[in-house]
Amino acid sequence: MFTYFRGELIEASPDEAVIEVSGVGYLLSISATTYRQLPEPGREVLVLAHLHVKEDLMQLFGFLEEEERQLFRLLLSISGVGPKLALAILSGLQVHEIQEAIVSNMPERLFEITGVGKKTAARIVLELRDRILKLRPSGGTKSVSRLSESSMRDDAVNALVTLGFLRSVAQKAVTESLTSLRNPQVEDLVRDALLTIRTP
């Protein structure tokens, strides 16, 4: 539902930022890494967004770099890693340092971050090593394409869930839309998926 926000940065702290877009203020949780790269309040900024939906709670997360958003989403796929811990990891090390720790099989680097236990660090390295390697330039354009598709699928599914549809129904409809549409954007996926869901 939300891919990015372009607007005026109203205020920011090491863990939150408020961006005003067309008179509406959006509160986004951010990493310390993103905070250090933000401009001064009052300046225009473009922040990439991730909408996290869990039961009756919706929370927006903001990133200045696509690479950081991708890594955030990968971390969320690990059992035991929620958005709070994922942000702590992104705040504890630079994105390239986290990637290097994972591909070099060095869970001890992640264990140095407050809140990351030894088992969680080991699980992150074990489950993400191959996926991180595929995202690197040597992995080829197909890997980047797959990531982009996965990102759009997640955004479209989350948008449909926000509209009140069951996640299983949303996932099925979005998957069908990805198959039938050519080079779709998130908005195209949501629109086509809605037609699929509402067609008897």
Swiss-Prot record:
Annotated stretches, region: Domain II: 65-143
Region (Domain I): 1-64
Assigned keywords, A-Z: Cytoplasm, DNA damage, DNA recombination, DNA repair, DNA-binding
Coiled coil residues, start to end: none
GO cellular component: cytoplasm; Holliday junction helicase complex; Holliday junction resolvase complex
Gene Ontology MF terms: ATP binding; four-way junction DNA binding; four-way junction helicase activity
SUPFAM superfamilies in UniProt: DNA helicase RuvA subunit, C-terminal domain, Nucleic acid-binding proteins, RuvA domain 2-like
Localization of this protein: Cytoplasm
Purpose: The RuvA-RuvB-RuvC complex processes Holliday junction (HJ) DNA during genetic recombination and DNA repair, while the RuvA-RuvB complex plays an important role in the rescue of blocked DNA replication forks via replication fork reversal (RFR). RuvA specifically binds to HJ cruciform DNA, conferring on it an open structure. The RuvB hexamer acts as an ATP-dependent pump, pulling dsDNA into and through the RuvAB complex. HJ branch migration allows RuvC to scan DNA until it finds its consensus sequence, where it cleaves and resolves the cruciform DNA.
Subunit comment: Homotetramer. Forms an RuvA(8)-RuvB(12)-Holliday junction (HJ) complex. HJ DNA is sandwiched between 2 RuvA tetramers; dsDNA enters through RuvA and exits via RuvB. An RuvB hexamer assembles on each DNA strand where it exits the tetramer. Each RuvB hexamer is contacted by two RuvA subunits (via domain III) on 2 adjacent RuvB subunits; this complex drives branch migration. In the full resolvosome a probable DNA-RuvA(4)-RuvB(12)-RuvC(2) complex forms which resolves the HJ.
Domain notes: Has three domains with a flexible linker between the domains II and III and assumes an 'L' shape. Domain III is highly mobile and contacts RuvB.
Name under which the protein is recorded: Holliday junction branch migration complex subunit RuvA
Biological source species: Chlorobium phaeobacteroides (strain BS1)
UniProt gene name: ruvA
